[in-house]
Amino acid sequence: MPKIKTHRGAAKRFRKTGTGKIKRNHAFTSHILTSKTRKNKRNLRKGAIVAAVDHKNIAKLIPYM
């Protein structure tokens, strides 16, 4: 059986934590930032955990991470 290929786009966007959860970055941080509040932009810098409903599909894309 051949090895499963890692989805390169997903590998650049997601990281696994030590406990097996998958971390992601927030969207809406690249442009049109003048209309967003300071607090909103600050909170968008923080990482987030992938939702439970998406976890299985994303884990398939990054099997060896």
UniProtKB/Swiss-Prot annotation:
It comes from the Bacteria. GO terms for molecular function: structural constituent of ribosome. GO terms for biological process: translation. Pfam families: Ribosomal_L35p. Keywords: Ribonucleoprotein, Ribosomal protein. One of its GO terms (cellular component) is ribonucleoprotein complex. NCBIfam families: rpmI_bact. Belongs to the bacterial ribosomal protein bL35 family. This is Large ribosomal subunit protein bL35. It comes from Geotalea uraniireducens (strain Rf4).
